[in-house]
Amino acid sequence: MTDSIPKKPFKKGSLVFVDRENYIKSIEALASDDDLPNYVFEGPGEILSVKDEYAQVRWRRPVPDVWLKLDQLKEYTQ
């Protein structure tokens, strides 16, 4: 069999930012504030936990951690 278990693209400690285009098209965006702060799109945020298709992200600011879908996140590179 050539089927393999897909690896999670991100793990605890990964640095990420939110992909604006994927976020805006998501159902989560409809349930949230339209005006997200720029730092979520610029990054980096650190993944604290991954569960199913969601990741808990902590930003380097005094704000609460958030859960975002993995397909809305991209790897942060300097």
UniProtKB/Swiss-Prot annotation:
GO terms for molecular function: oxidoreductase activity, acting on NAD(P)H, quinone or similar compound as acceptor; quinone binding. HAMAP family: NDH1_NDH1O. Belongs to the complex I NdhO subunit family. One of its GO terms (cellular component) is plasma membrane-derived thylakoid membrane. Disulfide bonds: none annotated. It is a peripheral membrane protein. Keywords: Membrane, NAD, NADP, Plastoquinone, Quinone, Thylakoid, Translocase, Transport. NDH-1 shuttles electrons from an unknown electron donor, via FMN and iron-sulfur (Fe-S) centers, to quinones in the respiratory and/or the photosynthetic chain. The immediate electron acceptor for the enzyme in this species is believed to be plastoquinone. Couples the redox reaction to proton translocation, and thus conserves the redox energy in a proton gradient. Cyanobacterial NDH-1 also plays a role in inorganic carbon-concentration. It is an enzyme of class 7 (translocase). Its main location: membrane. The gene is ndhO. It catalyses: a plastoquinone + NADH + (n+1) H(+)(in) = a plastoquinol + NAD(+) + n H(+)(out); a plastoquinone + NADPH + (n+1) H(+)(in) = a plastoquinol + NADP(+) + n H(+)(out). Its EC number is 7.1.1.-. It is found in: Cellular thylakoid membrane. This is NAD(P)H-quinone oxidoreductase subunit O. InterPro entries: NdhO (IPR020905). NDH-1 can be composed of about 15 different subunits; different subcomplexes with different compositions have been identified which probably have different functions. Coiled coil: none annotated.
